[in-house]
Amino acid sequence: MVRQFLFSCALLSSVALQAQKGDKPSPYWLDPEVNRVNCEAPRSAFFAYENTDLAQKGIKKDSKRFMTLEGDWRFNFVTNHNEAPKGFEATDFDDSKWVDFPVPGLFEINGYGDRIYKNVGYAWNTQFDNNPPFVEEKNNYTGSYRKEILVPADWKGEDIFLHVGSATSNLKVWVNGKFVGYSEDS
């Protein structure tokens, strides 16, 4: 039996969002002390091939234990974070008006938001005041991504890891409508 999963991701262009003073404790994405939830600790990369020959070749895509998620994903872009679609992680969410978007791919070089390159300084200085860790919801570009994948039946009972090579600035992931993780600056 093949298991079907719907991956939903939201990428925010901010590191943290400003919380109102006096509110109850901030959710993790508003807390500068929280960089990840349900993620493996950062470390050198490795991959467990099923045999020595494949390991010596070192080509992950040749392994039956590897699945690429590259390709077209359903994509929605909003300029202001608070306008991101609510409930888009639900398996029955209608994304028919969304566009197909190439992954890997930066939304800034695919026609969304502003192209930014900074190796020093504050990358979003044209969008809002430089006041880290506080960031406005306005002009806080947010991309929402959805993809349906089929997981091979022989993966049942195995640990499955999602490796995101790069996400700016943070990422939340759901599988079949259930939250599974959060990461910053992956």
Question: Model-flagged regions — what are they?
Answer:
Residues 69, 90-93, 180:
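Disulfide-rich extracellular domains of secreted proteins
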Residues 1-22:
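Bacterial Sec-dependent N-terminal signal peptides
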Residues 61-77, 100:
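Mature N-terminal segment immediately following signal peptide/propeptide cleavage
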Residues 46-58:
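Short, contiguous pre-domain boundary segments
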Residues 110-136:
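Surface-exposed, low-complexity/disordered Ser/Thr/Gly/Pro/Asn-rich loops and linkers
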Residues 21-40, 55, 59-60, 74-78, ...:
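Accessory beta-strand-rich segments of carbohydrate-active enzymes
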Residues 84-96, 101:
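Short Gly/aromatic-enriched secondary-structure transition segments
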